[in-house]
Swiss-Prot record:
It comes from the Eukaryota. The gene is med8-b. This is Mediator of RNA polymerase II transcription subunit 8-B. It is found in: Nucleus. Component of the Mediator complex, a coactivator involved in the regulated transcription of nearly all RNA polymerase II-dependent genes. Mediator functions as a bridge to convey information from gene-specific regulatory proteins to the basal RNA polymerase II transcription machinery. Mediator is recruited to promoters by direct interactions with regulatory proteins and serves as a scaffold for the assembly of a functional preinitiation complex with RNA polymerase II and the general transcription factors. Disulfide bonds: none annotated. GO terms for biological process: protein ubiquitination; regulation of transcription by RNA polymerase II. Residues 1-26, 134-160 form a coiled coil. It comes from Xenopus laevis (African clawed frog).
Length: 269
């Protein structure tokens, strides 16, 4: 008798520990759903479900263990009923049951489910016993086939989404050509130093060729300017003034006009 009592106490301690773990997991999961719903991800939710499933399987193994006595054969009798508030019961039930009176005992110590639930359980048990092994095997195969088709569709959708993202992110330029173009524009890398045809060899710094090309600046042509043009302009102005002075009836103009050459090149020294 003492051995059975010790075995029952050990079984109850194991069940209480397993149920406490399940309760803590449920509390944590509900807290996440209520307070962290905006940051939750599907992997986190699936991890929580997997944890709860594993804990329920462990509890089921404890109940089905051969060393676990059949709890349905045990009779629970309340030793003390009181309408007054009991602090010890409040602590054990975490504030859920403040009073252990005649009103709450039938609900908390009930060992049988509701009549509707009990009837449904009997119906399911009867259907399970009438099912043959061949029919059960066919149902299992059909279920496995449906799961395989579902997994194939999910994999196909994932592949199509990955291909779509790759098409969108495909490069429309050649990085090598882009780098070469930037290096040529910024540093002159890869550019050939060719001279136009008909031009002489290398010249000393500060000298220009016959074609008026500035050394080191290909494509920039210097406009040749000489002092003879200024002299010609001065002579032309002097001739105009002399002709005006020689004409009868006209007074010579005392206004001096300085005409600058409009073709003066800004780089002319």
């Amino acid at each position: 008798m003492q051995r059975e009592e010790k075995q029952l106490e050990a079984c109850l301690d194991a069940l209480i520990s397993q149920v406490s773990d399940i309760k803590n997991s449920l509390v944590g999961f509900i807290h996440k759903l209520e307070n962290e719903y905006d940051r939750l991800t599907w992997p986190s939710v699936l991890d929580s479900f997997a944890l709860l499933s594993g804990q329920l399987n462990t509890l089921n193994k404890v109940l089905k263990n051969e060393k676990t006595p059949l709890l349905r054969n045990q009779v629970i009798i309340p030793l003390l009923l009181s309408p007054d508030r009991d602090e010890e019961i409040m602590r054990l039930t975490e504030g859920r049951v403040p009073v252990f009176s005649h009103e709450v005992v039938p609900d908390h110590l009930r060992t049988k489910p509701d009549p509707d639930v009990e009837e449904l359980e009997k119906q399911i048990s009867a259907d399970a016993t009438r099912l043959t092994s061949e029919a059960a095997q066919k149902q299992v195969q059909s279920m496995n086939k449906m799961c395989s088709n579902l997994l194939d569709k999910i994999s196909k959708e994932e592949r199509e989404s990955e291909l779509g993202s790759l098409r969108q992110n495909k490069q429309t330029f050649n990085p090598t050509d882009t780098n070469a173009l930037v290096a040529a524009v910024a540093f002159g890398k890869g550019l050939s130093n060719r001279r136009p045809p008909g031009q002489g060899g290398p010249m000393a710094p500060g000298q220009t060729g016959a074609s008026g090309m500035i050394p080191g600046a290909a494509g920039m042509q210097q406009v040749p300017m000489s002092l003879s043009q200024n002299q010609q302009q001065q002579q032309h102005m002097a001739g105009v003034s002399m002709s005006q002075g020689s004409q009868p009836g006209k007074m010579p103009s005392s206004i001096k006009t300085n005409i600058k050459s409009a073709s003066m090149h800004p780089y002319q020294r």
